[in-house]
A protein has these predicted regions:
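Bacterial Sec-dependent N-terminal signal peptides
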Residues: 1-23
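Ser/Thr-rich, low-complexity intrinsically disordered terminal regions
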Residues: 19-197
Length: 197
């Protein structure tokens, strides 16, 4: 009797997990897929932009410079409804227009969405000499009367299963455009802020 219970205890996990299909396995807090040479990742089945920027400034100075820089961006709004700490704050990109050439728009002309404004959620975490920008829930919004006329970037970049990123040439170019736009938008060291009036 004890041998049967021991064998049952040993093989019980195998019986349980044998029923689980491959696409049901979810990896939490880890990148599931990415587009090479960009900061565009598939994490928890969502497309995000996440990058750590380095700086020569300590945390307090970096906080002040980030707040000043973000205050000058027309498309950025701080989220006053979320409690922020000294080293973390949240906001939204609202109606952000891409700074892209006509060639880039023509390359991605299958939808023409690069000409529409982008809305997204932004989280910023600050430490001494570095800060991390995480942008999620990215969607293009068309200015029409129709109530639900937006398209998530996940639609373009994810495979139907949601477990991987489509690695086609237009998707890689699109991710490169996103990556370049966000790198220039949130880089404190290259921002146009000056102390001169």
């Amino acid at each position: 009797m004890n041998t049967k219970l021991t064998l049952l205890a040993m093989f019980f996990p195998l019986f349980c997990f044998a029923q689980k299909q491959k696409d049901e396995i979810i990896v939490l807090n880890a990148y599931e897929d990415s587009i090479p040479s960009t900061s565009i990742y598939l994490k928890d089945r969502n497309i995000i932009y996440q990058k750590v920027f380095t700086s020569s400034l300590k945390q307090e100075e970096l906080n002040n410079k980030l707040n000043a820089m973000l205050g000058t961006l027309k498309s950025f709004r701080f989220n006053s409804g979320v409690y922020t700490t000294q080293n973390e704050f949240f906001g939204f990109l609202y109606g952000h227009k891409f700074n892209v050439s006509k060639d880039d728009i023509n390359l991605f002309n299958s939808t023409g969405y690069l000409t529409f404004p982008l809305d997204a959620v932004v989280a910023i975490q600050v430490k001494d000499y570095r800060y991390r920008i995480t942008i999620s829930s990215m969607e293009f919004v068309r200015d029409t009367i129709e109530p639900d006329n937006s398209l998530l970037i996940d639609y373009f970049l994810k495979q139907k299963s949601g477990l991987a990123i489509k690695q086609s040439k237009p998707n890689i170019k699109f991710a490169t455009i996103l990556n370049h736009e966000f790198n220039t938008l949130f880089n404190v060291e290259k921002s146009l802020l000056t102390t001169d009036f």
